Amino acid sequence: PTSFVNILLAASVEHTNIANNHYIDYGVSGRRSTRDTLQRAGIAYSGYTYTHIFEKDGVKIAFLGYTYATNVYWKTKAPRAGVYLPIIEDATVRRQIANARKLADFVVVSMHWGTEDSHTVNDEQRRLARLAADEGADVIIGTHPHVVQSVEWIEGKNGNKMLCYYSLGNSLSNQENIDNNIGYIACFDLVTDGNKKYVEAKPVV
């Protein structure tokens, strides 16, 4: 229900990624309702038709969001043709990260990917993480497996370093398995020092 947006407000959530496999479970009207509810609440989102740019103390951070698939196959028809589905496609990821780099100091990418209930990072996650690093993303925040996965630094083709959280696990869930009730919060600093810009990871306990 749309009233659940109040939970996000109570938790001081300022931004969310809406690209996930439930993105169009309730069709176009559900997607539109989600977007409108977030906008009315003043909560920014990515994973829709554009990259969200957040600015703090003169530093600009771009947020992008993608999902591996949606649960409902939906074919656009006039007059609704052109509705954007944020599926992970190599060309789209490359293009949007490149555009984001022109607009912002840092690029943070949400990836809804991986194998449910598996602590093991799969080959496709690693491939996509490498692609994002090569294109200049600074951080990946992964979701979907519902369990915790590893964190690592990935070096891009230009020598840049990208911090990748493959899966944060669950922060709130009705799943009963103990592994599904463990999650963590990604904590890192985006640092600007003169002409230098870099990411500093914080310990995750």
Where are these regions (language model features)?
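Acidic, metal/ion-coordinating pockets
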Residues: 1-205
